[in-house]
């Protein structure tokens, strides 16, 4: 009899926790403190009438345990594998500002992070 009450209370508590977890919007928690990937004006290099834009914002990233099959093929085995995409320029144009060649981004998207490539 005691075990039945204990199991019933545990199931009820579990269902309440699931309900509370669904009250929070998921997209708010995922992007906390970071805006989506888009063009923003670079205030340092922009001049009146000649704005310079660059891609800024957040994209997808995650970490998960490394599968055993993959771990066996690694030169230096690691327990955690991570994947990430970065906010990068999809299209750009070369511009000249104060005799300095700059890359002015014209379109952005989430793609492979350059610093992760080897």
UniProtKB/Swiss-Prot annotation:
<dbReference type="GO" id="GO:0010893">
    <property type="term" value="P:positive regulation of steroid biosynthetic process"/>
</dbReference>
<feature type="disulfide bond">
    <location>
        <begin position="55"/>
        <end position="108"/>
    </location>
</feature>
<feature type="disulfide bond">
    <location>
        <begin position="59"/>
        <end position="110"/>
    </location>
</feature>
<dbReference type="GO" id="GO:0016913">
    <property type="term" value="F:follicle-stimulating hormone activity"/>
</dbReference>
<protein>
    <recommendedName>
        <fullName>Glycoprotein hormones alpha chain 2</fullName>
    </recommendedName>
</protein>
<feature type="glycosylation site" description="N-linked (GlcNAc...) asparagine">
    <location>
        <position position="104"/>
    </location>
</feature>
<dbReference type="Pfam" id="PF00236">
    <property type="entry name" value="Hormone_6"/>
</dbReference>
<feature type="disulfide bond">
    <location>
        <begin position="37"/>
        <end position="87"/>
    </location>
</feature>
<dbReference type="GO" id="GO:0016914">
    <property type="term" value="C:follicle-stimulating hormone complex"/>
</dbReference>
<dbReference type="InterPro" id="IPR000476">
    <property type="entry name" value="Glyco_hormone"/>
</dbReference>
<keyword id="KW-0964">Secreted</keyword>
<comment type="similarity">
    <text>Belongs to the glycoprotein hormones subunit alpha family.</text>
</comment>
<keyword id="KW-0372">Hormone</keyword>
<feature type="signal peptide">
    <location>
        <begin position="1"/>
        <end position="23"/>
    </location>
</feature>
<feature type="disulfide bond">
    <location>
        <begin position="86"/>
        <end position="113"/>
    </location>
</feature>
<keyword id="KW-0325">Glycoprotein</keyword>
<dbReference type="GO" id="GO:0005615">
    <property type="term" value="C:extracellular space"/>
</dbReference>
<keyword id="KW-0732">Signal</keyword>
<feature type="glycosylation site" description="N-linked (GlcNAc...) asparagine">
    <location>
        <position position="79"/>
    </location>
</feature>
<dbReference type="GO" id="GO:0006590">
    <property type="term" value="P:thyroid hormone generation"/>
</dbReference>
<dbReference type="InterPro" id="IPR029034">
    <property type="entry name" value="Cystine-knot_cytokine"/>
</dbReference>
<keyword id="KW-1015">Disulfide bond</keyword>
<comment type="function">
    <text>Involved in gametogenesis and steroidogenesis.</text>
</comment>
<feature type="disulfide bond">
    <location>
        <begin position="34"/>
        <end position="58"/>
    </location>
</feature>
<comment type="subunit">
    <text>Heterodimer of an alpha and a beta chain.</text>
</comment>
């Amino acid at each position: 009899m005691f075990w039945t009450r204990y199991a019933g209370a545990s199931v009820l508590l579990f269902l309440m926790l699931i309900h509370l977890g669904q009250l929070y919007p998921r997209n708010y928690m995922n992007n906390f403190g970071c805006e989506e990937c888009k063009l923003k004006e670079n205030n340092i290099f922009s001049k009146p009438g000649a704005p310079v834009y660059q891609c800024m914002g957040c994209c997808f990233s995650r970490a998960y345990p490394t599968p055993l099959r993959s771990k066996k093929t690694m030169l230096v085995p690691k327990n955690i594998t991570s994947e990430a995409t970065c906010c990068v320029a999809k299209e750009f144009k070369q511009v000249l500002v104060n005799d300095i060649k700059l890359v002015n981004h014209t379109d952005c998207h989430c793609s492979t992070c350059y610093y992760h490539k080897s």
